[in-house]
Structure formats: C-alpha cells, structure tokens
C-alpha cells in the first residue's frame, strides 16, 4: 500500500518540511519522532498528518525508493520506513502489555512498568557466490515475483555463525559442500529488516546440483563470459555477480 508522503520533481524526490505541514497540523512538533541525521540534514517521522492543501505531494509505496534520486533521500526514505514499521510493532510491551515509550538517549523502546527494552529488528542474512574455477552458481527463486538470476541466499539461524549459515544454505538449496569462505561486504536492506552479508566460497567436491524445488526454480553454473546480468545500483547480489564476471574476484 501507499506509505510515505513525497514530492516528485524532475530531478528526483523530496520530503515535506515542517513549514509545509505546520499550518494544518498544530501538534506536529510535539508528535514528530527524530530518526537520524545525514550530512547535517535531520529527518523526523510524523504520522497521521493532514495534507488537504498539499497538492504537490503524494503518498507513495516503499518500492519508490528502489530507484529514486537523489540516493541519500532514497536511503533516508526506506530506512525511515523500516523504523516506522518497528515502532508500530512495539507500541506495547511484549512482556507485560503496558505501553512503551521512546528512550531519550538510545534508539530503543522502553517499558517503564517492567523495565523491558526493545531495540530495532535487524535480521542477519547471507548472499553466497559459490565458485568453481571460472564458473559461478546462479539461481532463480521459486514462486516469487522476482524472475531474474540471483545468488544463493538465506537467513542466519539462532546459535549459528555466519560461516555456518553459508555452508548450511548451500547444502539445503543445492546439495553442495563449500570451502574457503571469504567475506566480501555488507549492505543494509530495510525492505525486509535485513543486514545482508556477501560471501564468496569455493566448491568442495562434485558440482552436481540437488535442487530444493520449494526454494528454487533452477540453479545453473555459468562461466564468466556467459553470466546474464545488468548493472543495478542498489543490489549487493548484482555487484557480486559483476565482480566475478569481470574477473575481479
């Protein structure tokens, strides 16, 4: 659904300022929740605002932030969306049921009744580039709208190291063993409350694939010059594929 009030300009997006909203929203300064600062520009969360005479602004879906410009506002928008979801899900204490409040010092929700403290939800997940010489394993998801090739990926389980997550996900999804697990880089992915961590690893043994058809529609080995991929500014998966294709890893 629609979620964020935006102004769309020829050169990108913009958010409303307090001066745009204050005439129609008398308590906006008391109700605004500070989110974060980017290059000395402060961002706040304001809900249930009146926008009767704000014809230049529209309510937009979170997907608008995938390709919006400038990138720092797109990042601010989707990160604010993630925090808004977390605040909505933490209005009341899960331990005693009393109302929670924003802590004055930390990004945290606090229950004054029982002392419970809740921090933002961040789910660790891995993206895995399984390689075998000059070949990389690429897959397509089963039953999802996204139909392009991707790398293997999955969430970390409780009690598991990140390296164990890599080994388990590869075994579960394609039935292969891997070795020489190497960290590449990370990326926050606020669309799903996730912190993505990219790894490359080498095939350990035979390359015959045993596909988990509930998770994947297919999985194939591609040589560097055969890899089907196009540049994408916001995808760690895409970046890892291109790095391998160009012989940089």
What are these regions (language model features)?
Residues 1-90, 145-149, 191, 212-249:
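Nudix hydrolase/Nudix homology domain
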Residues 79-131:
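Cys/His-rich short segments
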Residues 105, 122-123, 150, 193-194, ...:
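Short glycine/proline-enriched turns and hinge-like loops at secondary-structure junctions
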Residues 108-151, 155, 177-178, 201-203:
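N-terminal strand-loop-strand
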Residues 150-185, 199, 203:
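The catalytic Nudix box helix
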Residues 187-210:
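Active-site-adjacent beta-strand/loop module that shapes the phosphate/pyrophosphate-binding cleft
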